[in-house]
């Protein structure tokens, strides 16, 4: 049973990363954490730092058995709609019984609107 569950999680990560590759050229999955960015850091990993002085688009997701934790969505490029596109990809890839965890809400109301628009999911805001 454990192998089946792990395979399902891998498939979900794979499915989401495939869809995200249209937005983020650099994606890496390490120990159930997906890192995606428009640029690489000095070590060659996707740069997902919130405090980066470089203009970038970045995303960090953590996958658990029946949940996805959104650790960060960063868009310092000035382009509009990144968060909405990321959420469209995530919501179209998961089952309704999944829990979506918002790690830190510094969005000035974005997450409240998403939660209100999609009450069929189980949301947790930290």
Q: What does each model-identified segment do?
A:
Residues 79-92:
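Conserved acetyl-CoA-binding loop-helix of GNAT-fold acetyltransferases
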Residues 92, 98-126:
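Conserved active-site alpha-helix within GNAT-family acetyltransferase domains
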Residues 28, 35, 60-62, 67-69, ...:
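Ser/Thr- (and often Asn-) enriched beta-sheet segments in non-cytosolic proteins
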Residues 71-81:
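A short, internal acetyl-CoA/4′-phosphopantetheine-binding micro-motif in the GNAT/acyltransferase core
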Residues 4-43:
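Short amphipathic alpha-helix that is part of the acyltransferase structural core
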Residues 37-72:
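A conserved beta-strand-loop-helix scaffold within acyl/acetyltransferase catalytic domains
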Residues 15, 19, 23, 89, ...:
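Charge-rich, solvent-exposed alpha-helical interaction surfaces
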């Amino acid at each position: 049973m454990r192998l089946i569950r792990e395979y399902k999680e891998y498939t979900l990560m794979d499915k989401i990363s495939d869809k995200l590759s249209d937005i983020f050229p650099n994606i890496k999955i390490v120990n159930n954490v997906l890192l995606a960015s428009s640029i690489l850091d000095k070590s060659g990993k996707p740069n997902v730092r919130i405090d980066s002085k470089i203009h970038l688009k970045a995303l960090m997701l953590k996958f658990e058995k029946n949940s996805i934790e959104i650790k960060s969505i960063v868009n310092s490029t000035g382009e509009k709609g990144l968060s909405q596109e990321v959420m469209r990809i995530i919501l179209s890839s998961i089952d309704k019984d999944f829990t979506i965890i918002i790690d830190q809400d510094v969005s000035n109301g974005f997450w409240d609107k998403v939660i209100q628009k999609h009450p069929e999911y189980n949301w947790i805001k930290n």
